[in-house]
Amino acid sequence: MSIISSWLLVSIICLTTSIVTKLQAAGVTTHLFYLTRGAPLSLKENYYPWLKAGSFFPDALYSCAPSNKDWSDFAEFTHWPNFLMIAVSYWQQKYGQNDRLRGTHGSLALKSFLIGVFTHQIVDVSWHSLVTDYRMHGLLRVLSETEFDGDIETAHTFLDVMGEFLTLNNVIRDSNNNENWDFLTRSDWKLPREEDLMEIIRNAGLSKEKLSYAELEFCVKRGMAAAISEGYLFRSQRNQLLTNIYSTSPRANDLILNHWLGGQSNLVAMLQRCVPFFETLFHDENTNEAQAEELRLCANLPPVSQKRINARPLVSSLKARKGNSHIVVSPMKSFSDFGTSLTMGKFREDNKDYLAVSAPLEDTVGAIYIVPWDILTVARKEDFSILQPITAMYGSKVGTYKASDVDYLLVSQPGTCTIDFYFKGVKILTIKDETTEEAHQLQFAVTGNFYDDKIPDLVVSSPSYGANETGIATFIPGSSIISYLTNSDKYQVVDISTFKGVINLDGYPMKIPFQHFGATIQISDTTDKQKLIYITCQSLGTVFVYSSNDLHDLSIPIYYITKNGVIPAKDSDHVEWHIIPSKEHGMFGAAIYSWNFEGMSFVAVSQPMFDTVFIYIEKSGQIEFFLKLVLKIKTKSDSIPDEFGSSLLFNDEEKKLYVSSPGSFDARGSIWKISMDELLKAGNDPKRKTLLINNLRHLMLINPDKSSKGVSNFGNSMILGPQNHLIVGIPQYGYGNFDHMQLTGRILVL
């Protein structure tokens, strides 16, 4: 069904169920959701009705009377910090300067309402790509360019309308989740006292004659009615709505969750940083221009991580709980995303094994937990809680750089385009990129030995790099890095451009705006001197393959791999390259994994939006299609992906390929395993080039936690630890919690 048909369905159902309106309500549920992420716990218990009304207030007058220019102009004004400065100034004069009134119901109701308004302002700027100097990079812009052929209006409507139902789907896994349903559909919105709110509105320039309290209350309550209607509509038509959404844009939900500017991780970090500052304005006796400027910054920032953070050693509580055949480890701390990225290494002086776990949301700047592997032996016998060292930083991805039998911990800070090296817990080197103002989201991708000198080379990349997000992959020779590591008595900061032998690939000869070259990178696991380098150009739905023997800035791929086959470079002139939407490419190349089995080099390329993994075999620098894995499990809708192939891992000891599917089983998530014997048998059969993956034969594990609310992203990351233990990241555990323990994250050790 087309996107227009989908919206028509929404309109018809709205009319037949007496819903007040459709388009005026766009975003109301989204703003309620972000309110739960940003509102202070101290106000949530008793003042949610005023918080909710405030979170919709800036949009209330836009469509209540579309022909009323005074109302629409005032609505625009309420979207910006000057309105809040006027409102806080009123609150200070009325309540703040009187200790007897400061804690009264009227005071706290007005404060809660204004906090709701502030959360709305923060979300709108990034969500709708309004950030100054970053308008080409926000969520709406990228969705428009990659999914809707640059049609910003269609993308805007899709985001505002269908984004509501994606948000509902993410926080409510099934119809029995009554607590969240009640919050979203409760008729409890309230405005502050009439004398307070109308005086603020008059001070902001709209007279009593142009807007009455009754009119304003009516317009705000329309938002409440719309939120209730959206909830009931989704509850009754969930499967049909999601089928329409995923048929139109399979990757939209991933962008809403994870996009670096306007995605939920970005917005939650901003809310967690900015709302506490806004609260301080209620403690000061007077508001000033410096505070107004800080508010403007909070509502107009690129990711919070853009602020450079100095790493500092801390300790934090870590809890482990044993299950039947697994161990669960978590910091039990809201807004952490613990488990986003994992790596093993000997990272401390005792030369023992440690697990490094990133928690990129923690304290709005992120943290890396360094977990001794020994404690997991204790956890197999009893539950425990201990204090563990962590390093405060923005660490969305961690890795291990092994040189001369020494393990260095790599930590990416994409907001500052820096990669840090840690030796025995001490930061000794930072690699940064200041070659251009359009360097965005650069981070560690992979290590490999391209020059046969036994020194690992480093690859960093970013699909968002450049003014038009064309993307980049940068290769830094290990021989240029090693001297900085061996002279580790002094911390050094080095710009990428100063290293000798650096190679920058940008997808040449293709350079199409928003092609997102460098989304995923993998190096073939082969004993051959010539290694193949696989780089995903995500919005072209293509994996570019380069030879390590011919690597320079203007290198041309020797192969292009798409879902339809392997294209040698000599045949690529016949291909018309252009941006294609995810409903066609299915996120082909979202994950790439290479392994060697009995002298044969295999490469798996996932297509998680179509629940498919393609397997190729390398032979003397040649690539051949070998087998396709397709997940087939009975679900309510085949259009809603199980995200099979989100993460890939080969277990040498078991001789099995592990594949995660975070969206399976009502988004609980699962891990599947396929033996090499079965892969080889199916791949070598000329009549059978597809292997169907099913519950009976291939299901290894369903997320054992049945009670969690919302999506958890189970299996977002997987690695093997000592003694062949599988470690599974569950970074969004607690996603559906609206008050305590939101987005704590956890890991599972099998």
Swiss-Prot record:
Keywords: Membrane, Transmembrane, Transmembrane helix. Pfam families: Zn_dep_PLPC (PF00882). The keyword Methyltransferase does not apply. The keyword Chaperone does not apply. GO terms for molecular function: glycosylphosphatidylinositol phospholipase D activity. It is found in: Membrane. The chain crosses the membrane at residues 1-21, 465-485, 586-606. Its main location: membrane. It is a multi-pass membrane protein. It comes from the Eukaryota. Gene3D superfamilies: Integrin alpha, N-terminal. InterPro entries: Int_alpha_beta-p, Integrin_alpha_N, PLPC/GPLD1. Signal peptide: none annotated. GO terms for cellular component: extracellular matrix; extracellular space; fungal-type vacuole; membrane. This is Uncharacterized protein YJL132W. It comes from Saccharomyces cerevisiae (strain ATCC 204508 / S288c). The lineage of its organism: Eukaryota, Fungi, Dikarya, Ascomycota, Saccharomycotina.
